[in-house]
Amino acid sequence: MTPKEFKKTYWPDIAASCEETGLNPLFVAAQAALETGWGKSAIGHNLFGITATKKWRGAVKYVRTFEYFDDDKQGHRFPKVHSITRMPDGRYKYVVDRAFRDYTSVRECLTDHSRILLTER
């Protein structure tokens, strides 16, 4: 997807969502473009790579990813660990299946993304 196609596809939903939340639509669009490589690698309708924690009650999609940690004791974080390799710099590369939120629509994703950004921690 080209940047122009990305804008045509996602801008209407991003603009409408931001109108409701007060978030800057340019910020939201930029983050979505960065996270998906201009729409090339979105996980379902998940434009932001939002992972599914234990509290998440919606649908989940498992995707194989690479994660890097300073030790080899992080496997408990993932449903499946395929390999752990010590890198030359001393860090560990994990090949894992990671759980991502699987939204039914782009609007559902944008609503959840806004909620995450606007919730005080």
Predicted regions and their residues:
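Catalytic cores of secreted/periplasmic lytic hydrolases that degrade extracellular macromolecules
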Residues: 1-121
